Design a protein with these regions (language model features):
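A short glycine/serine-rich beta->alpha loop
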Residues: 4-6, 63-68, 323
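Helix-turn-helix-type domain boundary/helix-start signal
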Residues: 7-8, 43, 72, 174
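Alpha-helical hairpin
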Residues: 9-10, 45, 74, 92
Length: 352
């Protein structure tokens, strides 16, 4: 976590009061008054001194006073200072880590793993779990087959090294005979199995420049079919637990919930937000307006990239109210990212 400029200007008593107030508010969901802080902050100061410090924190934009209460609640800036400088991590226990590892088994296919990760994050936080899918071009393909569907359409069946199977309908510029499709599939399987999709097209084009006669025709056919069959698929993500937000007190406004569910359905804005975090190591936290997406201004997003084979594949995280238990959610998200990456790694450390 980075040090907040606002935090660095606070004295130890103000930091302790701010942490105690935000922790109590996260736990209880009620504005916190000076009497409560006097009992729980562990400071040997009078309620009057506490009130003065709270007034200073409010002037600094870290707290606000609801009109209906004498207590105070944190602002988005207050939460930012909290997660940057005052959070006290509570890593998941042995049982929780064992559950993550057991349910994100490397024996499952990638899509099943992503589904398990999002479901687990939702179940363990009671908020929304989200996982961006790895870009398929980062994966090696194991086998390809072409099946003619009609005069102009061909079904490409791709089997990847992580046991995922994708079916893609392509429309080549020319009609291919079954024997031609078989020759192209045999060529691609013999020469490119085990290679990442992103590498194959460039290699085909290089070989085509140096080929002659019959080999040139085979390579030309391979380039055309591979260009469509192995093209990058659209980005996607897996969400779980969206309906759990309906029971969150802070998100009880129906119009706000409707806008949130529209964002979940379209996926585009959340994918763009996750893309912003993919190259940043460690946990990233967006609080309210920091997301840059109006319907997400009432929530926080805690994310971490997951890696396999030294390569960042995607991002996972939790979407919940700003009043979430950051002490627990932050290390849980990081642990889940580590476990998912290990499950996706084709060469885990124990096998190297």
């Amino acid at each position: 976590m980075r040090a907040s400029p606002v935090h660095s200007s606070l004295d130890p008593r103000a930091r302790q009061l701010l942490r105690t107030l935000i922790s109590r508010y996260i736990r209880d969901g009620e504005p916190v008054g000076s009497q409560t802080l006097a009992r729980h902050a562990g400071l040997d100061v009078s309620p009057a001194t506490i009130r003065n410090i709270l007034a200073d924190l409010e002037d600094a934009g870290l707290l606000s006073s609801p009109h209906t209460s004498a207590g105070r609640i944190p602002t988005a800036t207050g939460y930012r200072v909290f997660v940057d400088s005052l959070v006290q991590m509570r890593p998941p226990g042995e049982g929780e880590v064992a559950r993550l590892r057991a349910e994100m088994s490397s024996a499952a296919g990638t899509q099943a793993l992503l589904g398990s990760a999002s479901e687990l994050l939702s179940a363990m936080t009671h908020f929304v779990g989200v996982v961006s899918a790895p870009k398929r071009e980062q994966f090696a393909f194991r086998h390809i087959d072409f099946v003619p569907l009609d005069a102009r359409r061909v079904l490409a069946i791709l089997v990847f090294a992580d046991n995922e199977v994708q079916n893609r309908v392509i429309e080549p510029r020319k009609a291919y005979e079954p024997a031609e499709l078989e020759r192209v599939a045999n060529y691609l399987n013999a020469h490119f199995a085990g290679r990442a999709l992103a590498d194959i097209r460039a290699s085909l084009l290089r070989e085509l420049r140096h080929a002659r006669d019959e080999m040139e025709l085979l390579l030309a056919h391979s380039v055309e079919l591979a260009e469509q069959a192995l093209a990058p698929a659209g980005d996607d993500m897996v969400l779980a637990g969206q309906t759990k937000l309906m029971g969150v007190q802070d998100l009880s406004d129906l119009e706000r919930l409707r806008e949130l569910f529209e964002i979940f359905a379209s996926k585009r804005e959340i994918l763009q937000l996750l893309e912003r975090t993919i190259q940043a190591p460690g946990v990233r936290i967006f609080i309210g307006e920091e997301t840059g997406v109006v319907p997400l201004e009432s929530v926080s997003l805690v994310t971490a990239p997951y890696m396999a084979g030294g390569q960042v594949l995607g991002v996972l995280g939790v979407i919940g109210p700003k009043r979430m238990d950051y002490d627990r959610v932050i290390p849980l998200v990081q642990t889940a990212a580590d476990v998912l990456g290990a499950a996706l790694d084709p060469n885990p450390p124990t096998e190297r």
